Regions:
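Catalytic loop of the DD-peptidase/beta-lactamase superfamily, centered on the K-T-G motif
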Residues: 1-38, 160, 165, 169-173, ...
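Extracytoplasmic/secreted proteins, especially bacterial periplasmic and envelope-associated proteins
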Residues: 4, 8-15, 61, 66, ...
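Residue-level signature of the cytosolic catalytic core of signaling kinases
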Residues: 5, 9, 55, 82, ...
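Short active-site loop at a secondary-structure junction
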Residues: 18-26, 46-106, 137-151, 215-218, ...
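Short, solvent-exposed loop/turn elements at domain surfaces
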Residues: 36, 47-49, 115-117, 277-278
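Short, solvent-exposed loop/turn and secondary-structure capping segments
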Residues: 38-40, 116-121, 186-190, 345-347
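The feature captures the short pre-catalytic strand/loop hairpin that immediately precedes
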Residues: 46, 126-138, 199-213, 300-307
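Active-site helix/loop module of the DD-peptidase/beta-lactamase fold
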Residues: 58-62, 74-114, 118, 134-136, ...
Length: 358
């Protein structure tokens, strides 16, 4: 990598790894549209397996950016509309609180207080229906944002229904394969398991447990190389041959709601560039990120703004990820680690690096 990139990355990430006691880490910087890769530490401590550019990390909620783009692609194909009622795609959802709740509300956490997690006891599809039928909203749809796997997870499940494909098939054929993300998985195949890092939680090696709607909300695993490609695709959608995918990426970066200086997209979250670093760093803290916040609807939604800081945090029990990019600058970063360490430390490091390179 050019000296300047090398220097700022090592100056920023080495102390982060020490402070946060991160066993293994992979970072990609996209500079003038090109990726530069850096790796540290171990994917498997017991086997002394180093992190490489082929190591698979759990993305956690960065998975939501794939779900948002897949939903955008379904919109571009004319299969769904964000303004459609949820019940159009799930007629069994007859409880009256679902009147007026649209796919947009599900995709953007604004249905009225769907919970962060789908309860663990929800296993079967009948359990899932019962859970949503019995849920009681705290607010009218489109008034408050409460970040929720149970919200965007249901959006992902319903968005693929008209295609007749399973969620995994739709994601593979419509997003992963066209973008040549050939080492990005919802279910890691046996041949790839040798590359699958262990996550570390309180010193114990862990992998994410299965759960209802997990694929849509937090289930993707990927390598630093594929994630750099993902950022490149989101930075420059016009370079993508598949027209519906190109539109889907643009729809995912459109601005549907505003809360404070943050705009909610489909999976992605945006702030105007230049950005106030305190705002992105503090805003990523779970105390703020997971709190209910009033939203202002943007009607019609603002199309993707190139002068934006576009980002998403993600975690599972043993992994912590972060992706941020600035389309106008052709600049971006991916940070993958096999420890779930605090969001503000991730965003702060990303800001230091991208701000130095802009």
């Amino acid at each position: 990598a050019p000296q300047q990139i090398n220097d700022i990355v090592h100056r920023t990430i080495t102390p982060l790894i020490e402070q946060q006691k991160i066993p293994g880490m992979a970072v990609a910087v996209i500079y003038q549209g090109k990726p530069y890769y850096f790796t540290w530490g171990y994917a498997d401590i017991a086997k002394k397996q180093p992190v490489t550019q082929q190591t698979l990390f759990e993305l956690g909620s960065v998975s939501k950016t794939f779900t948002g783009v897949l939903g955008g692609d379904a919109i571009a194909r004319g299969e769904i509309k964000l303004s459609d009622p949820t019940t159009k795609y799930w007629p069994e959802l007859t409880a009256k609180q679902w009147n007026g709740i649209t796919l947009l509300h599900l995709a953007t956490y604004t249905a009225g207080g769907l919970p962060l997690q789908v309860p663990d006891e929800v296993k079967s599809s009948s359990d899932l229906l019962r859970f949503y039928q019995n849920w009681q909203p705290a607010w009218a749809p489109g008034t408050q944002r409460l970040y929720a796997n149970s919200s965007i997870g249901l959006f992902g499940a319903l968005a693929v229904k008209p295609s007749g494909l399973s969620f995994e098939q739709a994601m593979q054929t419509r997003v992963f394969q066209p973008l040549k993300l050939n080492h990005t998985w919802i279910n890691v195949p046996p041949a790839e398991e040798k590359n699958y890092a262990w996550g570390y939680r309180e010193g114990k090696a862990v992998h994410v447990s299965p759960g209802a709607l997990d694929a849509k909300a937090y289930g993707v695993k990927s390598t630093i190389e594929d994630m750099a490609r993902w950022v490149q695709s989101n930075l420059k959608p016009l370079d993508i041959n598949e027209k519906t995918l190109q539109q889907g990426i643009q729809l995912a970066q459109s601005r549907y709601w505003q809360t404070g200086d943050m705009y909610q997209g489909l999976g992605w979250e945006m702030l105007d560039w230049p950005v106030n670093p305190d705002s992105i760093i503090n805003g990523s803290d779970n105390k703020i990120a997971l709190a209910a916040r009033p939203v202002k609807a943007i009607t019609p939604p603002t199309p993707a703004v190139r002068a934006s800081w576009v980002h998403k945090t993600g975690a599972t029990g043993g992994f912590g990820s972060y992706v941020a990019f600035i389309p106008e600058k052709e600049l971006g970063i991916v940070m993958l680690a096999n420890k779930n360490y605090p969001n503000p430390a991730r965003v702060d490091a990303a800001w230091q690096i991208l701000n130095a390179l802009q």
